[in-house]
UniProtKB/Swiss-Prot annotation:
Record protein name field: Larval cuticle protein 16/17
Range of residues in the leader sequence: 1-16
GO molecular function, a single term: structural constituent of chitin-based larval cuticle
Chitin-binding type R&R domain ranges (all copies): 34-107
Keyword Methyltransferase: no
Organism, scientific name: Manduca sexta
Tissue localization of expression: Specific to the epidermis. Expressed in all the epidermal cells of day 3 larvae except for the bristle cells and those at the muscle attachment sites.
Domain of life: Eukaryota
Record key words, sorted: Cuticle, Signal
GO cellular component, one term: chitin-based extracellular matrix
Cross-referenced PANTHER family: CUTICLE PROTEIN (PTHR10380), CUTICULAR PROTEIN 47EF, ISOFORM C-RELATED (PTHR10380:SF173)
Induction info: In day 1 epidermis, by exposure to hydroxyecdysone in vitro without juvenile hormone.
Lineage, opening ranks: Eukaryota, Metazoa, Ecdysozoa, Arthropoda, Hexapoda
Function: Component of the cuticle of the larva of tobacco hornworm. Seems to participate in the formation of 5- to 10-fold thinner lamellae in the endocuticle.
Amino acid sequence: MKLIILVALTLAAVVANEPEPPKILRSEYDQKPEGSYVFGFETEDGISRDETGEVKEALDEDNKPHSVVVVRGQYSYVDPDGNPQVIKYYADETGYHAEGDSIPKVPSRR
């Protein structure tokens, strides 16, 4: 019986010490019938993301037209050292491309 009480008290202490999830300060989403969209959010702990998507026509490997969604956006957060980080990105028929101070740069060939 003492073991059950000890386990119950331990579990209660663990649950009581769980941090609250960060509050959402802003949240938006709008999708159009043709497939384009805009969305974004921001939380009280410094995390945010904003993104747009637009449908465009592109050519595949066989030069046949097809629709692709071109995505552009950015996200930000505070790293463990307290530094704000911002990553900007886009994705299209050529792939995903991101840039930011925390992303290593590819050295140029000479």
